[in-house]
Swiss-Prot record:
<dbReference type="InterPro" id="IPR022281">
    <property type="entry name" value="ATP-dep_Prtase_HsIV_su"/>
</dbReference>
<dbReference type="Pfam" id="PF00227">
    <property type="entry name" value="Proteasome"/>
</dbReference>
<dbReference type="GO" id="GO:0046872">
    <property type="term" value="F:metal ion binding"/>
</dbReference>
<keyword id="KW-0888">Threonine protease</keyword>
<keyword id="KW-0479">Metal-binding</keyword>
<keyword id="KW-0021">Allosteric enzyme</keyword>
<comment type="function">
    <text>Protease subunit of a proteasome-like degradation complex believed to be a general protein degrading machinery.</text>
</comment>
<feature type="binding site">
    <location>
        <position position="162"/>
    </location>
    <ligand>
        <name>Na(+)</name>
    </ligand>
</feature>
<keyword id="KW-0915">Sodium</keyword>
<protein>
    <recommendedName>
        <fullName>ATP-dependent protease subunit HslV</fullName>
        <ecNumber>3.4.25.2</ecNumber>
    </recommendedName>
</protein>
<keyword id="KW-0378">Hydrolase</keyword>
<feature type="active site">
    <location>
        <position position="4"/>
    </location>
</feature>
<dbReference type="InterPro" id="IPR001353">
    <property type="entry name" value="Proteasome_sua/b"/>
</dbReference>
<comment type="subunit">
    <text>A double ring-shaped homohexamer of HslV is capped on each side by a ring-shaped HslU homohexamer. The assembly of the HslU/HslV complex is dependent on binding of ATP.</text>
</comment>
<dbReference type="InterPro" id="IPR023333">
    <property type="entry name" value="Proteasome_suB-type"/>
</dbReference>
<dbReference type="GO" id="GO:0004298">
    <property type="term" value="F:threonine-type endopeptidase activity"/>
</dbReference>
<feature type="binding site">
    <location>
        <position position="165"/>
    </location>
    <ligand>
        <name>Na(+)</name>
    </ligand>
</feature>
């Protein structure tokens, strides 16, 4: 997924989700202050996206509806969205990834409906994801920073490497 970076960090009993603000169209930067992370379900769930903006908003709406249906149960809502994503002909064409988290779980929901919960409590998606992931793992292992501080610094490192990621970073924490 070209054009963004989103990272989620679970550390010291907290969870933080951070995303950059850059939106690109081909080789052109179209927007610098997009909001790619948001709070859902009574501010108890964090979600971020990488990929097509229109597709991501469709998935946010679907995921939020699943959260309502399953009373904020993140895992159940993710599994049900994954099932629908795999079986619905329209949804299968959507090009986006979601990273979602609550106080207990952190999940990546992929475009083919797969759901992955990382072992180390760190997940990153988008073109700058590998850089942010590596930075966050190092910061968790070698600093006493908070989850929010780690997410922000990992995003800054990714933005210094990935041309599709800027340093207009929004961090949400639970």
């Amino acid at each position: 997924m070209e054009g963004t970076t989103v990272i989620a960090v679970r550390h010291q009993g907290r969870v933080a989700l951070a995303g950059d603000g850059q939106v690109t169209f081909g080789n052109t930067v179209m927007k610098h202050k997009a909001r790619k992370v948001r709070r859902l379900y009574q501010d108890r769930v964090l979600a971020g996206f990488a990929g097509s903006v229109a597709d991501a908003f469709t998935l946010f709406e679907k995921f939020e509806a699943k959260l309502e249906t399953y009373h904020g149960n993140l895992q159940r809502a993710a599994v049900e969205l994954g099932k629908e994503w795999r079986t619905d002909r329209f949804l299968r064409r959507l090009e986006a990834l979601l990273v979602v988290a609550d106080k207990e779980h952190l999940l990546i929901i992929s475009g083919n409906g797969e759901i992955v919960e990382p072992d180390d409590g760190i997940a990153a998606i988008g073109s700058g994801g590998p850089y942010a992931l590596a930075a966050a793992r190092a910061l968790v292992a070698h600093t006493s920073m908070t989850a929010g501080e780690i997410a922000r610094e990992a995003m800054n490192i990714a933005a210094s490497i990935c041309i599709y990621t800027n340093n207009n970073i929004i961090v949400e924490e639970l």
